[in-house]
Design a protein with these regions (language model features):
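Terminal-appendage/accessory-domain detector
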Residues: 1-94, 191-204, 211-430
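Glycine-rich, mobile lid/loop segments that gate access to catalytic sites or pores
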Residues: 113, 117-204, 208, 220-227
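Well-ordered alpha-helical scaffold segments within catalytic/enzyme domains
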Residues: 38-41, 105-112, 155-162, 209-213, ...
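Well-ordered alpha-helical segments within folded domains of soluble proteins
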Residues: 99-106, 150-157, 203-208, 267-271, ...
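Hydrophobic alpha-helical hairpins/lids featuring a short glycine-rich hinge
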Residues: 81-133
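A generic short alpha-helical patch detector that favors 3-5-residue windows
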Residues: 2-3, 96, 118, 146
Length: 430
């Protein structure tokens, strides 16, 4: 059976009654975390996003409370959520930030006047589809960006919210996939604002094509398995594990990860480890031993040793570790050190190595060892296998609320989301 049809069958068969309480709790945690990220981002992004509202009018309500067309509201919300690179993560053959899709789900829900239960159901559905595709195959190793899988997951979520039948859901998935194969260049070398915008566009596309499918527009019948479909063109007919789809059960959110620090997820454990080391003498060199994905994503070229933008810095393992070592802290103000002489000097002494044993431990563990060697040839090390926020060491609701408040989310919004299951005609505004 065509993969899109397998996904569509899961989407239409899955329902709210299949969601257990732990999954509901974690979905609420993800909504709080995502909306808090959006709140903090708004002050930086409003000058880019708000002027477009005049020409893209509609009845969907954005997280800022302004109205827009539902597709632009989806882009708007998702850009705000993704911009900080501080929302959740999933790590497998392909990484994903599944809560990116929450921006589109909330935008569509505001227009449809969906209930809180409808939203929880849609998020559980979208997460399951998106992360299952990440289990099936790696896009990044083939030069394609992970937002391709995000778009399929978001289309599944939008289809669920729109209550589409199996045939129309399959069309929405096809329309989300075939025209929207995004290049990994978004995340290569020196990074731009599109690091956040790529996810937002993918979610916008997903909501838009779900509406097209609802109206009866059809997509290619074999978007995954056709002669010119994803599996044959991108995966060369191999390297995509169809059996992953057999494991879909709606609990995938439990395997996603929340960030403690505002940096790319592969750096979370490294920052924690760096904070364990108190520099005492002149540093001769710093060695970071880690797994393949962390090295490939966070130390792939010279720009990561001398980042010029915030977008590159939060994907730079040498910079992130150096700042944490020198300041014994890591928060948004840490990015003010991009051009700091002491940080640049220490960064130049950093070496990043892939350790085969660590690569074999990934993705169930994210091992990193940092060793600081001093000029007198003494040294000290710190090791982490997983950071706080990993599903093996999860952040609880209280810790997530503390993070949300630090990002500027107030009690009114937090209380509203905490009680989302009982809401009718849901609208979330920060």
């Amino acid at each position: 059976m065509e993969t899109a049809k397998k996904i569509a069958k899961f989407v239409t068969d899955f329902s709210y009654k299949d969601i257990d309480e732990k999954v509901k709790d974690e979905i609420i945690n993800r909504i709080i975390d995502a909306v808090a990220n959006a709140k903090y981002s708004y002050k930086d992004l409003k000058i880019f996003l708000d002027p477009l509202l005049e020409n893209l009018k509609g009845n969907a309500i954005t997280l800022s409370g302004k109205k827009a067309s539902v597709d632009y509201a989806s882009f708007y919300n998702s850009f705000l959520i993704r911009y900080l690179d501080f929302n959740d993560t999933y790590l497998s053959k392909e990484p994903l930030h599944p809560s990116d899709m929450i921006g589109g789900i909330l935008a569509l829900a505001s227009e449809l006047k969906s209930s809180g239960k409808d939203v929880i159901e849609a998020i559980a559905t979208g997460y399951e589809v998106g992360i299952t595709l990440c289990d099936a195959g790696s896009l990044r190793k083939r030069g394609i960006d992970h937002v391709v899988f995000l778009g399929v997951g978001a289309a599944a979520a939008a289809s669920k919210l729109l209550k589409l039948n199996e045939e129309k859901t399959a069309n929405a998935i096809s329309l989300a996939l075939v025209p929207h194969i995004a290049l990994r260049e978004t995340r290569s070398g020196s990074l731009s604002m599109w690091k956040g915008g790529a996810a937002a566009e993918s979610v916008r596309n997903a909501v838009f094509v779900a509406l097209l499918a609802k109206s009866g527009i059809t997509g290619p019948e074999l978007p995954f398995t056709g002669k010119m479909g994803l599996i044959n063109v991108i995966f060369d007919g191999k390297g995509f594990d169809e059996t992953a789809l057999e494991r879909m059960n709606g609990s995938g959110v439990l395997r996603t990860l929340i960030k403690e620090f505002p940096a790319e997820y592969h750096a979370q454990a490294a920052i924690e480890a760096a904070l364990d080391i108190k520099l005492k003498k002149e540093v001769k060199n710093v060695t970071i031993d880690t797994y393949e994905a962390a090295k490939t994503i966070l130390a792939d070229d010279a720009s990561k040793w001398k980042p010029q933008t915030r977008e590159t810095a939060d994907h730079s393992l040498p910079f992130l570790v150096s700042v944490a070592l020198l300041t014994q802290n890591f928060w948004f103000e840490s990015y003010n050190f991009i051009h700091d002489k002491k940080v640049l000097e220490l960064t130049s002494k950093v070496e990043v190595n892939e350790v085969e044993e660590y690569t074999k431990m990934y993705p169930s563990s994210l091992p990193v060892k940092i060793t600081v060697k001093y000029s007198d040839n003494t040294q000290e090390s710190a090791y982490r296998e997983v950071p706080k926020g990993h599903y093996k060491k999860p952040m609880n609701r209280e810790e997530i609320i503390t993070k949300a408040k630090r990002l500027g989310l107030d009690d009114r919004v937090i209380d509203y989301i905490n009680n989302i299951e009982n809401k009718e005609a849901l609208t979330v505004v920060f």
